[in-house]
From Swiss-Prot:
Pfam families: DUF167 (PF02594). It comes from Heliobacterium modesticaldum (strain ATCC 51547 / Ice1). HAMAP family: UPF0235. This is UPF0235 protein Helmi_20270. GO terms for cellular component: cytoplasm. InterPro entries: DUF167, YggU-like_sf. Belongs to the UPF0235 family.
Length: 96
């Protein structure tokens, strides 16, 4: 699949590897076929997932409702789906 895949209907799915309890929220580039994202939130009671979705939405200039977690709720490796942005725009906004 690669780290990013266009879906029928215009949405984009991509894989991320989350590092919780980091010193700041940031995108660190590609690591092992996934986008590495560092988050300050701890991996407790869904806090890191919520912070991840909010951070990705803000980074892409989207509303939180346009970003959803598709797979990996309890894993560091997650698959997200976004609407309202092209694959090319996604790469540019993440500087990949």
């Amino acid at each position: 699949m690669g780290w990013i895949q266009e879906q029928p209907g215009g949405s984009i799915r991509f894989r991320i590897r989350v590092q919780p309890r980091a010193s700041k929220n940031e995108v660190c580039g590609l690591l092992d076929d996934a986008l590495k994202v560092r988050l300050t939130a701890p991996p407790v009671d869904g806090e890191a997932n919520a912070a991840c979705l909010q951070f990705i939405a803000k980074t892409l200039g989207l509303s939180r409702s346009q970003v959803r977690l598709v797979a990996g709720e309890t894993s560091r490796l997650k698959t997200l789906e976004v609407e309202g942005v092209s694959a090319e725009d996604l790469r540019k906004r993440f500087d990949i």
